[in-house]
Amino acid sequence: MNVAIITGASSGIGEEFVRQVARQTKIDEIWMIARRRQKLEQIGKTVKKSVKVIAMDLQIKDNIKQLEDMLKKEKPSIGLLVNCAGYGIRKEFSKGSLEEELGMIEVNCISLTALTYLCLPYMQKGGRIIQVASAASFLPQAGFAVYSASKSYVLNFSRALNKELKKSEIYVTAVCPGPVDTDFFLISDKGSKMPSYKKYFMARTDQVVRKAIADSNRKKSISIYGVSIWLLRFLTRFI
């Protein structure tokens, strides 16, 4: 059985990955991971694919151990891993709570790294890993300091890992979207208002995910949707 594991699967980009991956014939079952069981179950009923609902908070280390034990017991053949769980808080570093700032590192970096490590032994030749980073990874962002730094980690870790795993014919793609029309900003902008100009670059989740899957299939190390975000990446090389 060829399994896809998708974190952050209860909303936004993660939910869209579930829907689009469910249409792929090479995947037999989707493991959906997120905190909200009810939402996962609702989504699972709408896709024409066998699903396993795993309701857990990846910020809790005991849950990572629980997932490790599940993998050891079931020994799935993982064809695709999508690390989409993550969040950001937009406010000055000194004005945020320590719990918020460390939480971003726990979910965006540590949990992503742990899941990647735990899943690799179950991946075969031709396997794919998609890590959701952000255009915020391209340069430091005041007011979004920890988030942008955490996504820089995701980008650089993914690119390095892609080089390491090529000999095993497992390919890693870092997805670096700009603003996407999801609930992300309902959480991130509690501390401050999203810059108004970003609304003009807002992309749809289906567009970003479709491009990400296509780029992963093409064995690209980075997936960027939209000319404006490509231009941003190009310009940051000179800053």
Question: Each PLM stretch: what is its role?
Answer:
Residues 134:
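Residue(s) in the substrate-gating loop at a strand-loop-helix junction
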Residues 10-11:
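Conserved glycine-rich cofactor-binding loop
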Residues 116, 150:
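Active-site helix of classical SDR
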Residues 84-89:
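Conserved NAD(P)H cofactor-binding loop of Rossmann-fold oxidoreductase domains
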Residues 174, 195-233:
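C-terminal helical subdomain
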